[in-house]
Amino acid sequence: MAFASLIERQRIRLLLALLFGACGTLAFSPYDVWPAAIISLMGLQALTFNRRPLQSAAIGFCWGFGLFGSGINWVYVSIATFGGMPGPVNIFLVVLLAAYLSLYTGLFAGVLSRLWPKTTWLRVAIAAPALWQVTEFLRGWVLTGFPWLQFGYSQIDGPLKGLAPLMGVEAINFLLMMVSGLLALALVKRNWRPLVVAVVLFALPFPLRYIRWFTPQPEKTIQVSMVQGDIPQSLKWDEGQLLNTLKIYYNATAPLMGKSSLIIWPESAITDLEINQQPFLKALDGELRDKGSSLVTGIVDARLNKQNRYDTYNTIITLGKGAPYSYESADRYNKNHLVPFGEFVPLESILRPLAPFFDLPMSSFSRGPYIQPPLSANGIELTAAICYEIILGEQVRDNFRPDTDYLLTISNDAWFGKSIGPWQHFQMARMRALELARPLLRSTNNGITAVIGPQGEIQAMIPQFTREVLTTNVTPTTGLTPYARTGNWPLWVLTALFGFAAVLMSLRQRRK
């Protein structure tokens, strides 16, 4: 009785919400304890039972603050190291980001208790998953979005991974919320029926993991080499280091020419404008073509626009076998989804003078088109994404083509040091390979550089913070997963049906 009385206190529930939210971080890499996702979501739902809407909103906010405060604290590393501001200000900015993201979980909990106040099957199994899908969409869309720490990613090695090629990672989010709600209902009501339904729902997708939505093409197997330059972020944009950086990448690449069909350098490996490096690029292109290899590299490009100003792009270009390199070549990719404050500054004229954090190197990029053709290198078709873009499942899928041989992502996670951020980023990249059933080539400055198989499995990788080359044979695949064909539309239809049913049934119950 004493415990029952204690748990009814709002302050205790707020504290528990913080703890359950923080527990959710364990579901993601590098911890990979996927049951933590269910425990965390179950805690969120259970703590909002029998609460008024404002109380539930506060619980949802505290839960979100626990999740994001522990799960994205890696942002502090880049702010503290490169932001040029006092320690208390750095901490405040991280707290502010976590608090902002927590508004969406607070919105979820508050609306859920406002529209479906009773602790029923309707609330946990129908209303909650649909509402969660909407609030998670808003978190990934408003102010360019930040869809980090979606619990579906915890299943990349879990029992529900087979659902990803069928309906995408967001469908796993949906099912996890439903299962967690039913478990919370079973616990609070001490009723075995919701428990049985939860177990059945959780088990149903398990056989899907054994379906192969792709066909390997062993006759097209190639040797791929990815150069991990391990250039310290503090030196990366130092003009005096440019020549040394080029030497590091060239010296690692020269022995690979004629052996590896495809060589990959990471994001902005060439830390200079493309137009300034024409002699180097043309000489390297000629050497690669002579030896039958191709190179894909990150670089910075600046083009004069119609207003007679320069647009600067975070770019991928190709060199080597095939048509000679040309600055006018369309065989390039310009990053579309830019990171706020890292690659562009909102309210630039106001914020830039305030602190060095708002004036970081290369923080004035322009956007490339949302849809861009695949890169072609040595007859290989590559659907590309730069850094942050790989976490945007729908955008990667929209750029995917049936003739894509591989997914390609290049990145520079040196901003975040030895934190958990790069591992979470890597986990999300793996999900893209699983959703689209294509091998994924991930080349980074200091890790995690890896080859991911078409079922999201790690085929080869090299350690972080080392100057190494990952060389391995990779077999392309063909075939389209249901998710590749339809995207998130089936899930949104399901969300609309669940939402409509939840509202209709709630209205009927109130009339009785």
Swiss-Prot record:
Keywords recorded for this protein, A-Z: Acyltransferase, Cell inner membrane, Cell membrane, Membrane, Transferase, Transmembrane, Transmembrane helix
Pfam annotation, one family: LNT_N
Function: Catalyzes the phospholipid dependent N-acylation of the N-terminal cysteine of apolipoprotein, the last step in lipoprotein maturation.
Alphabetical GO biological process terms: lipoprotein biosynthetic process
Pathway: Protein modification; lipoprotein biosynthesis (N-acyl transfer)
Protein family per UniProt: Belongs to the CN hydrolase family. Apolipoprotein N-acyltransferase subfamily.
Transmembrane segments: 14-34, 57-77, 91-111, 168-188, 194-214, 487-507
Protein name: Apolipoprotein N-acyltransferase
Active site annotation, chain numbering: 267 (proton acceptor), 335, 387 (nucleophile)
GO CC terms of this entry: plasma membrane
MF GO annotations: N-acyltransferase activity
UniProt domain CN hydrolase: residue ranges: 227-476
Subcellular location, record wording: Cell inner membrane
Keyword Acetylation among record annotations: no
CDD domains: ALP_N-acyl_transferase
Top-level EC class: transferase
Record-listed E.C. numbers: 2.3.1.269
Organism: Escherichia coli O157:H7
Membrane topology: Multi-pass membrane protein
